C-alpha cells in the first residue's frame, strides 16, 4: 500500500489520505475504518472482506480514474464479522473516530485502538471455550528451534528448545497454535503450510539484545537468570519477537504475564505428530472433538478445567512422583464420594482464568465482573468443603484457592446482579455505590419531576398564578410569567427572553439545575466509566494471587473430574514401578467401549524383559488396531494421573509413544501412502529407546509383497534386537510369526474369529500363538463385494495355497476396457439351475439334485 499511497495520495480527499496513512502502517492486515455507523474497508481489503464475509463490494470516489473498491459492516454488528475473519486466520485493525465531528475543521481524527489477530484473542466471543488459543513464535538455528508460546487469554507464557524437524512437527501438533510468528528468512515454511495465521516478521524482531531487554522490562528483573533459560538463545529470541508483537497488537504491557516457564521435553512422555493423530487424543481423524480420548474423559465442571485436562492428556508426565500425587488426590476424592459436592460447587464457578486476563488488559466487560463476583463469593463454601480433606496435594490446592473478601465485597456492592453487556451505555453500577453518580443519574432520570417541584414551590412563594417552568433548546430552562404579572417578578428573577404576551426568567437555582441536567447523562456515563476503571485497578492489585487461585481451581476441577470418571467408567488406579514392564489385565479401549453398542471384550497384555515385542496376527476387523491403541491410551491416562480402563495395570517408565498406523497420502507434500508410512517408520527407528512404547500396524503393505515383507521383517528385527522397545507389531505377513524362534524376547499373539454357516464371527479375544488364517475373503464378503468376485477370489486362494505360482488363466487377458464391461460366464452349477424345471421334480428327485449340485459346487 505504501507504493499506492505515494502515487495517489495527493489525488484523494483528506479523509482518504488519512486512511492511506493508517493502512500504510498495517499493509498485511484488514483495516476496519470507522465512518459514522459503519466500519469501511477499501481497495484490496474490501475485495478480500467481501469474498470472506459474503458482503457487498461497492465503490467510493476514484483513484487514477478508477473507482475505489469499498465494503462495509455495521458498527453494532462488527464483532460478529471480526470473529469470522479471525477464525479464517485474518488479522483486523480497528480504527475509531476519537475526535469530535462538531469541533473538527478537517476530517475527524481517527486512530488505531485495537488490533485483533488469531493468536492474541481475549474476547470471550472469539474464543473456543474448552481449547487454548495460542500465539507461537519460532526461531531457527539450523536444526535447533526456539519456541515461545503465549496464551494471552489464560496468562501463560512458556519457552522451550527442540532439535530436529520431527520434534518441531510434534510440538506444532501438540500446541495447534492459532497464529505463528517466524522470521522472513525462516527456512522451513513448508512445514507450516497446513497452519493458518502464519505471520512473517522482520529479522530484527528476533534480535537477542532486544529480546533480553523486553523480557527484563516485562518481569521487572535485571537479567533472566531466575528463569532457567541460560544458553537458550533461540528460545529467548522467539520470546522477544512474541512479546514485541503481542504488545503492539494489545496496546498494553500485558501485566497478567508474570513469569516465563521453561518446558523440557524430557519432563513428559513424548508423543510425535503421527501418534497424536492416530490416538485421537483430543481431535479425531476427521478433525472433530467427538469420539476422542478427551471427549470420554472430560466431564469437567469448568471451562478452565477442560483446558487443563487437554493439556495433561497431550503432555503426560514422566515423573512418577507427580503422578502419584494426582493418584492419591483422586483416591481421597473417591472416599465417601467427596468429589460430588465439590463438582456441584465448581459448576457455579466462572472462567476466572480468562476473566482475570481481560481485567489485566482492561477489556473486561460488566458480565465478566459479575461472574468473577459470583466465583469469589463461592470460595468460602469451597474452602469449608475442603477442610475435611487430608491429602497433602489437595490441601496445597485449597490454600492456593484462598479467599478474597475485599474484592468479593467490592464487586457485590458495585455491580448490578445482571448488568448490561457493555459499560458504554451505563447501568452497570448499583444504586448507592457512589453518591455523586446517584445524583447525576437522578438529575438525568428525574428532570421532569424536579421541574414540577420548582414550579409548585415558586407558585407558592410568589403567588403568581400564571407562573410555569419550561424548556427549549435555544434558551434552555426558564420560568415564564404572563405580561400582566411579569412586573411582580421577585428580585432574584433574571430576565432571559421577552415574548409578545410573556416574559421568561432564570433563577440561580434553575441555572444550577440547567447546568447539571444538560450534562448529567454524559457526566453520569463518564463517572460510571471512571469508577468501573477504578474497580479494574483494584482487582489488578491482587492479580497474582487471583491467578494462582484460578489455576488451583482448574486443577481441583480436573482431579474431581478424574474421580467421577473413575467411578462412572469403572477405572482402576495403575501401579507405577521402576521395573521395565507393562502389565495389563482386562484392558479396555476407553473410547470404543463408550461408543460401541456391543459389550467390549477386555484383553490382557504383558510386556517385560522376557517378552518386549508381540507379533500380532489375526483377521481384519478382528480388533488388532483397537488392542494396540487401547494400550497406548492406558499408558497416556496412567501418566496423566488418571485411573485407567482395566482390571489391573502395572507400568514402568515410558519415555515416548510411537505409532505407525493407518494409511493416507500426503498430497500437499507430494508423498505417497508408502512414503508417509516409511517416513513414520524411519522416525521410530531413529528415536525410539528401550523405554519407548511402539505400535506398528501393517508395516510394508504399501509396496510389493516381497519388498513389504523384507522391510517389515527388518524393522521388527531391529526393534527387537537393537532398540528393545516395548513393541506391538501387527501384521498379515505370517512369515514374521517365525521371529520368536530366533529372538527370545519376541512372542506371538493373535485375535480370534470363527466361521459359522459361511459367515465369520469376530471374538476380539487375544490368545497366545500365531493366527491360522486372515479371513480376508470373508471380510470382503461382509463389505458387500459382489458374489462372483468372492467366488473367483476363493478359487485363486485354493490355487495359491496348493502351490501354484500364479492364478490359472482360461483365456488371454482382455484389455482393461473390455474387462470392465465383460459379462461374467455362469458356473456349471448356475447353468444346471437355469435349465432345471423345479415343478416337474418329485421330492426324492429334488433331494438327489440338491446333493448333486452341492458336490459340483465343492469340486468347482
Curated annotation (Swiss-Prot):
SUPFAM superfamilies: DNA repair protein MutS, domain I (SSF55271), DNA repair protein MutS, domain II (SSF53150), DNA repair protein MutS, domain III (SSF48334), P-loop containing nucleoside triphosphate hydrolases (SSF52540). Pfam families: MutS_I, MutS_II, MutS_III, MutS_IV, MutS_V. ATP binds at residues 618-625. The keyword DNA-binding applies. PROSITE patterns: DNA_MISMATCH_REPAIR_2. It comes from the Bacteria. Keywords: ATP-binding, DNA damage, DNA repair, DNA-binding, Nucleotide-binding. GO terms for cellular component: cytosol. GO terms for molecular function: ATP binding; ATP-dependent DNA damage sensor activity; damaged DNA binding; mismatched DNA binding. GO terms for biological process: mismatch repair. The keyword DNA repair applies. InterPro entries: DNA_mismatch_repair_MutS (IPR005748), DNA_mismatch_repair_MutS-lik_N (IPR007695), DNA_mismatch_repair_MutS/MSH (IPR017261), DNA_mismatch_repair_MutS_C (IPR000432), DNA_mismatch_repair_MutS_clamp (IPR007861), DNA_mismatch_repair_MutS_core (IPR007696), DNA_mismatch_repair_MutS_N (IPR016151), DNA_mismatch_repair_MutS_sf (IPR036187). This protein is involved in the repair of mismatches in DNA. It is possible that it carries out the mismatch recognition step. This protein has a weak ATPase activity. Belongs to the DNA mismatch repair MutS family. This is DNA mismatch repair protein MutS. It comes from Hahella chejuensis (strain KCTC 2396).
